[in-house]
């Protein structure tokens, strides 16, 4: 049983964070009850999602009263490949006052209760917010040079990509979005206008929030842009954005609202669109392993190459700022990381040296964690790690790790047993009741995963072909497509 109590004095300076009630959990729920008593002088909005039961509405003196009760909730939330915001009934509750220190949209200025308000009204608030934050922008010397170079490019999409990828370069090397999330709509529109690139404005929500057609809160909206060829641009992110030509996975196939209007765009006209998605061939991870048995140890050299959305969140973890600056900066005349500091030469060189020391430790730690994550156990020894390709433009992000593992080779009499399954990637552990599933499996995007293992065995040993069949027999081919079953290539 959870109790929440908020003092009205808090609402004079800031609003209460949104409250979410999920009608489901990790285990079946016998009895779930929600009771709310909210001052009538506040604006109370709620939205029920995915078939969540509605509140019974009432009043008590100066308060709005909301009650809901559900018994015997048998539906549970699996841990694997499940999106609660798309698959579990839940209700979002927003309580707002007209506080001075925050921007309060028009729809939230009406006192009292608004049950499941029209999403278009909240969309109008989001367009208005975009409009009031629109302004002219100035940039530092190097960025202005990039803009001037972009103007020389004949293709409008490539002009936009050139500027966006430079901003992405700065985002990666500084580990911080070059344009803030809230300013992106204003600053990138300013840049596209400056570059004379035609565009549509988009309002969209990501897959971790409600659909735009059921919008409940303007702060869940993302400002974006779509060109006539379907190319889209969204706020820079250290977690999801890779390059201009790859739409972040959290926005793919999401419904959006668009307008082509340039002046007074907040008034429309609007149209419904869908952000383009990707295919499995666009998002690939290719793993090549050379493994050698050394007694009961396994010496492994593993190369991992990713494309598309599979690059998300990986580049910064394993690549030094210096290497990223040189690879991503080649098109912009950047030859070293220090050039990306808007400081004097001495200060820039000093900061670059400090960053190099930080990278040396953090990258080593990240690679150690990567090896542990891949095999579900730590390496005995890490011999070498290196990034071969930094993933700039549409190139793969590729790295090589050389290490030694124990526990993957065991002696059984005169035989050696190799845990080949732990060479093909991290194992998914699905236990107990979750092994029987009656809800959809939701992956963030389609992908292709391929592993090639070359195992060098000691002299005098041969491989039993029958043992490889176990890698196929444990897979239900009606659920997962295997383009090429495991086979013995050579001994």
For each predicted feature, which ranges?
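A carboxyl-terminal module marker
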Residues: 318, 328-479, 483, 487
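Short, Gly/Pro- and small/polar-rich lid/capping loops
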Residues: 267-279
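Short, well-structured beta-strand/strand-turn elements
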Residues: 171-175, 193-209, 445, 461-467
């Amino acid at each position: 049983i959870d109790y929440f109590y908020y003092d009205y004095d808090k609402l004079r300076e800031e609003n209460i964070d949104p409250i979410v009630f999920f009608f489901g959990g990790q285990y079946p729920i016998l009895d779930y009850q929600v009771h709310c008593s909210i001052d009538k002088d506040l604006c109370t909005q709620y939205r029920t999602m995915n078939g969540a039961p509605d509140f019974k509405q009432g009043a008590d003196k100066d308060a709005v009263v909301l009650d809901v009760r559900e018994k015997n909730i048998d539906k549970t939330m699996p841990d694997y490949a499940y999106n609660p915001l798309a698959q579990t009934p839940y209700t979002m509750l927003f309580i707002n006052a007209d506080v001075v220190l925050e921007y309060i949209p028009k729809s939230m200025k009406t006192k009292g209760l608004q049950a499941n308000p029209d999403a278009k009204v909240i969309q109008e608030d989001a367009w208005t917010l975009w409009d009031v934050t629109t302004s002219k922008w100035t940039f530092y010397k190097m960025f202005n040079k990039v803009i001037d170079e972009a103007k020389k490019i004949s293709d409008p999409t490539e002009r936009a990509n050139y500027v966006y990828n430079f901003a992405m370069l700065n985002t990666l090397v500084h580990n911080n979005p070059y344009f803030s999330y809230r300013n992106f709509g204003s600053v990138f529109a300013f840049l596209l206008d400056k570059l004379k690139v035609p565009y549509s404005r988009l309002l969209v929500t990501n897959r971790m929030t409600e659909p735009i057609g059921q919008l409940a809160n303007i702060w869940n909206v993302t400002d974006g842009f779509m060109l006539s060829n379907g190319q889209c641009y969204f706020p820079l992110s250290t977690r999801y954005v890779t390059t201009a030509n790859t739409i972040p996975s959290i926005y793919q196939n999401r419904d959006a609202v668009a307008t082509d209007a340039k002046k007074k765009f907040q008034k429309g006209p609007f149209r419904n669109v869908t952000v383009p998605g990707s295919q499995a061939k666009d998002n690939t991870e290719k793993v090549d392993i050379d493994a050698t048995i050394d007694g009961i140890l396994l010496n492994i050299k593993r190369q991992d190459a990713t494309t598309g959305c599979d690059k998300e969140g990986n580049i910064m973890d394993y690549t030094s700022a210096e290497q990223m600056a040189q690879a991503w900066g080649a098109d912009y005349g950047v030859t070293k990381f220090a050039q990306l500091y808007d400081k004097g030469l001495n200060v820039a060189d000093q900061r670059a040296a400090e960053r190099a020391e930080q990278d040396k430790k953090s990258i080593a730690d990240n690679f150690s964690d990567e090896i542990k994550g891949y095999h579900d156990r730590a390496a005995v020894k890490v011999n070498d790690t290196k990034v071969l390709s930094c993933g700039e433009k549409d190139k793969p992000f590729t790295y090589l790790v050389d290490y030694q593992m124990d526990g993957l080779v065991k002696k059984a009499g005169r035989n050696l047993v190799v845990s080949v399954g732990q060479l093909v990637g991290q194992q998914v552990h699905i236990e107990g009741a979750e092994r029987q599933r009656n809800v959809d499996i939701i992956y963030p995007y389609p992908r292709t995963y391929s592993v090639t293992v070359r195992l060098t065995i000691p002299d005098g040993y041969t491989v039993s072909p029958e043992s490889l069949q176990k890698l196929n027999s444990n897979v239900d081919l009606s659920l997962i497509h295997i383009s090429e079953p495991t086979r013995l290539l050579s001994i």
